[in-house]
Amino acid sequence: MTEKKNLSCSFCGKNREAVDKLIAGPSVYICNECITLSYNIIVTDKPSKDSDSLSLENLPQPLEIKKFLDEYIVGHENAKELFAVSAYNHYKRIFYPEQDEIELEKSNILLVGPTGTGKTLFAKTLAKKLNVPFAIADATTLTEAGYVGDDVESVIERLLTLADYDIDLAQRGIVYIDEVDKKARRSESNVATRDVSGEGVQQALLRLVEGTIIKVKLGNGKKYSEDFIEFDTSNVLFILGGAFVGVEKTIERRLTKSSTIGFNATVIDADAKNNLLSKLLPEDVIDYGLIPELVGRLPILISLENLTEGQLRQVLSVKNNSVDQVKTLLAIDKIELEFTEKFYSDVAKIAIKQKLGARSVKSIVEYSVMNIMYRAPELQKSGVTRVVFDNYPISLDKVPTLVYSDGNTHTDTEYKIYRGLNEKATLE
């Protein structure tokens, strides 16, 4: 008994009463604390496979990046090319050997476009292609340091966490900050009026975007003994996005500013008005309310137009689309879903009317199958193997058809149309 009481860790010297567990080897003992410390040292020092995977030699070129974006994003051809080149140049800059006479500056990106045009998807898909950590934040939740809410640097904490605290990997990651336009307020007279707290957030963003060293607080599961770690944002690709509602008026005002009354007056036709975002310049964003210093650190300005009805139809065919997702979910219940081209066309028409872009397509599709999903176990037990949607079920005369294992088919008389999205689902 005396011998057991005197047992101690062969590494730190603590006796068994001072630790939670003491593990015995052939001739040595190790406590739980030394095991944890040793594991952290090994994991921290171990080179990350992900951080080694991206280099100048295997960096995807613009054509390859664009092709990958095409798999997930419909339309926006020019925007995808600009985006691909900008991302390629950013990472070339990271891997380019430093030379005294040439300093390559960061090329952060500002995406401007209406809701549902795919701003977030652009950033997320790029990170997927490059296999780098990706953190997203909503600018509306960000506040200046000292105020209630998340400060701007919290997004870097998130990036580091997603990189499993691999500092080198995180410092090559991508940060997307959405709704940055909400930090730039405008008055009813269309004159930009700065929101003091919003401008404070912009100033804090400026510091991160241009590249600085900050101290990041480490959370639970940290690999380092310190509570803080220094993080250099110089090589992080920052992508800021926003709808900038009403910026078209700013563009139109700029385009007509130099016009004169009479025969020489500049007239903007209807087609040009529908494509005003394609003429967006940095000065328009500044006039909207972003501070010039921040806009200057976002040299790549990319505008995204609303998708056409035909393009919204294509959204149902891209990789990981909403149709494939609901089909997979019901396949688990051993029920096959079938949609006709008329159904797809109806979805696109409804999405156009709702004016929420590609984002609404997923909701529209999901609402159509909600009642089938609710009754799936019951339908499967009754012998239903397939459900066919010939139209979008906006009314009870357009409900789906049930196909049974014996080959018989019946109109789904029990189908229920849920209110909500379908209240606006008109095809007239």
Question: Each PLM stretch: what is its role?
Answer:
Residues 2-24, 29-33, 39-43, 47-135, ...:
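AAA+ P-loop NTPase nucleotide-binding core of proteostasis motors
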